[in-house]
Design a protein with these regions (language model features):
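Conserved N-terminal glycine/acidic-rich loop preference
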Residues: 73, 123-134
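Active-site-proximal, substrate-binding regions of enzyme catalytic domains
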Residues: 42-71
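Histidine- and aromatic-rich ligand-binding microenvironments
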Residues: 5-6, 35-36, 92-96, 115-117, ...
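A generic structural signal for short hydrophobic patches within well-formed alpha-helices
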Residues: 10-11, 40, 120-121
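Active-site neighborhoods of divalent-metal-dependent phosphate/nucleic-acid chemistry enzymes
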Residues: 70-122
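Short, well-structured N-terminal submotif of metal-dependent ribonuclease cores
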Residues: 1-35, 50-61, 128-129
Length: 134
């Protein structure tokens, strides 16, 4: 099974938060992850902002390892235009709209979205996605 994984779900693997164990259970039970290119930036910045130097190195190494096994959707013109449309329709914020468009590109409504972001989850459900986590 393929899962679209947003930054809020991935971050929980490297930074101890509420639902970190749930995120691991969901993600480690699956063999294929897909996400948008912008997730790389979101996760790296979250690690940098929230962890000390030693923890940051460990988390960054773990994230880089996970990133190698993740299929990445390019944020090309088509995806960006679709994100703008989806943002208008759902009221989603910019990065959330990019996640929705990338998930759509990754396989449409047949690919569940794993997120712990309530607003992204609501927007995804309103578009007919199965949302896991929030």
């Amino acid at each position: 099974m393929t899962l679209y994984v947003d930054s809020s779900a991935l971050i929980k693997r490297y930074v101890a938060e509420d639902d970190s164990e749930d995120a691991d259970a969901i993600l480690l039970g699956d063999t294929e992850w897909v996400t948008g290119r912008h997730t790389f930036v979101e996760v790296h910045l979250a690690i940098h902002r929230r962890l000390g130097e030693t923890e940051r190195r460990v988390a960054t190494t773990a994230f880089e390892r996970d990133w190698q096994r993740t299929f990445v959707v390019a944020l090309d013109d088509v995806v960006c235009r679709r994100a703008a449309e989806l943002g208008i329709v759902t009221g989603a914020r910019s990065l959330d709209a990019l996640h929705l468009a990338a998930a759509e590109r990754a396989g449409g409504r047949s690919v569940p979205i794993v997120t712990f972001d309530v607003r992204l989850g609501q927007a995804g459900r309103s578009l007919g996605f199965v949302v896991i986590g929030s």
